[in-house]
Amino acid sequence: MARRRRPEKREILPDPKYGDVVLSKFMNSVMLDGKKSVAERILYSALDSIEARVKRVPLEVFHEALDNVKPGIEVRSRRVGGATYQVPVEVRPDRAQALAIRWLIAASRARSEHSMSARLSGELLDAANNRGNAVKKREDTHRMAEANRAFSHYRW
């Protein structure tokens, strides 16, 4: 572990089409085996199909979906005197964003549509409307934290 200083955060360039940094992070998470052009094609085609289906700006739908999936609180394991407690802690904004991106992509990959772009657009639309597996994951996380509220004094 570094003793001296925290490494500075890397600057992520905004995506070429919409000029959005969060969308660029999402694209990097969709990417497999370093194939960014494939990830770009999947994401942009998903956003185009969202625009065709709901007649709204796809970037607004994307950010709405992301906000609906971001967790506010999560549980972390804390060992106290031989027992392990699930302690509820608040989620930092950067971690909340990373978790939301991860959950949206995992939920998309688990869907049954034919292409990844169709699965991604479906999951983003569901999340924007507070439905879908990614939103369910967030609600499960919040429910778990609520159930373990008694251990919140073990926070660190």
Curated annotation (Swiss-Prot):
Keyword Ribonucleoprotein assigned to the entry: answer is yes
Kindly indicate whether the keyword rRNA-binding belongs to this entry. yes
Q: Which Gene3D superfamilies match?
A: Ribosomal protein S7 domain
From the Swiss-Prot or TrEMBL record, give the protein name.
Answer: Small ribosomal subunit protein uS7
User: GO biological process: any one?
Assistant: translation
Q: Which GO terms describe its cellular component?
A: small ribosomal subunit
Q: What is the lineage of its organism?
A: Bacteria, Pseudomonadati, Pseudomonadota, Alphaproteobacteria, Sphingomonadales
Give the gene symbol: rpsG
| Originating organism | Zymomonas mobilis subsp. mobilis (strain ATCC 31821 / ZM4 / CP4)
- What keywords are annotated for this sequence in UniProt? Ribonucleoprotein, Ribosomal protein, RNA-binding, rRNA-binding, tRNA-binding
**Which SUPFAM superfamilies did the record assign?**
Ribosomal protein S7 (SSF47973)
**What does the record note on quaternary structure?**
Part of the 30S ribosomal subunit. Contacts proteins S9 and S11.
- Tell me its family: Belongs to the universal ribosomal protein uS7 family.
